[in-house]
From Swiss-Prot:
The chain crosses the membrane at residues 1-21. HAMAP family: TatA_E. The gene is tatA. Forms a complex with TatC. Keywords: Cell inner membrane, Cell membrane, Membrane, Protein transport, Translocation, Transmembrane, Transmembrane helix, Transport. Belongs to the TatA/E family. The keyword Cell membrane applies. It is a single-pass membrane protein. This is Sec-independent protein translocase protein TatA. It comes from the Bacteria.
Length: 69
């Protein structure tokens, strides 16, 4: 996971705990979760819109001289 070992992750978590305090961690986690949920929702909507636009676009046909006659 990002090239971090167990000791590095524990150190990062301890620093976060010291900076924000134990009482604010659940609130921060909720906010992060909501943000990720909104991001994934927007990503899915954009992908669906893009796929629908591709499906709705008729394939362009190359005209040949025989087609014009």
């Amino acid at each position: 996971m990002f090239g971090l070992g167990g000791q590095e992750l524990i150190l990062i978590l301890l620093i976060i705990l010291l900076l924000f305090g134990a009482k604010k961690l659940p609130e921060l986690a909720k906010g992060l979760g909501r943000g990720m949920k909104e991001f994934k929702k927007a990503q899915t909507e954009i992908e669906e819109e893009f796929n629908n636009a591709i499906e709705d676009t008729p394939a362009q046909k190359k005209e040949t001289i025989k087609d014009k006659e």
